[in-house]
C-alpha cells in the first residue's frame, strides 16, 4: 500500500496505519509494560489505544513503532514456557485478571481480527490479487512439544 492509502478511513473503519500502531500498542502493553516494566513509546496508547479518538498516523512512523516493539516482545516471548501461561502478571501491586496464556490468546485473536480488517480495507481500495492465507501454509504445520 502507499503512504496515502494507509491513511484512508472508510466510514467507521480504522485506517491501516492506525491498525499497525494499535497492534504495537497491545504488544507493548502486554509483553513490555506488564511483562517487563518497559515502555518504548509512552504516547502510543493516547494515539492508537482502544477507545481513543480516531487518528491517521503516518505509515512509516507506525511501521517503525511496530518493528521496535515486536523486536523487543519477541525476545520476551521466547522466554515464556508452558508453566508461565497459567500465571498472572502483577502490575503496580495488583494481579492482572487474565492469565498470561489468556492474554496470549487475546493477542493472537486481536491480530487475526485486524488482519481481516486490513484485508477488507485493501479490497475497498481496489487492490487485486490479495493473498488467500497468511504465511506459507505448507511450512506452518503443527509440531507437538517434545
Language-model segments: which ranges?
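Short, flexible helix-adjacent loops and helix caps
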Residues: 2-6, 82-85
Amino acid at each position: 500500500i502507499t503512504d496515502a492509502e494507509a491513511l484512508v478511513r472508510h466510514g467507521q473503519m480504522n485506517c491501516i496505519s492506525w491498525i499497525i500502531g494499535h497492534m504495537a500498542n497491545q504488544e507493548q502493553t502486554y509483553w513490555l509494560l506488564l511483562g517487563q516494566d518497559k515502555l518504548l513509546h509512552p504516547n502510543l496508547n493516547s494515539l492508537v489505544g482502544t477507545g481513543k479518538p480516531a487518528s491517521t498516523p503516518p505509515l512509516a512512523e507506525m511501521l517503525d513503532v511496530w518493528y521496535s516493539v515486536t523486536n523487543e516482545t519477541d525476545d520476551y516471548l521466547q522466554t515464556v514456557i508452558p508453566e508461565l501461561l497459567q500465571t498472572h502478571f502483577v502490575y503496580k501491586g495488583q494481579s492482572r485478571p487474565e492469565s498470561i496464556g489468556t492474554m496470549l490468546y487475546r493477542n493472537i485473536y486481536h491480530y487475526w481480527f485486524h488482519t481481516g480488517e486490513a484485508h477488507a480495507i485493501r479490497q475497498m481500495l481496489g487492490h487485486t490479487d490479495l493473498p488467500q492465507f497468511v504465511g506459507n501454509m505448507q511450512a506452518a504445520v503443527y509440531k507437538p512439544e517434545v
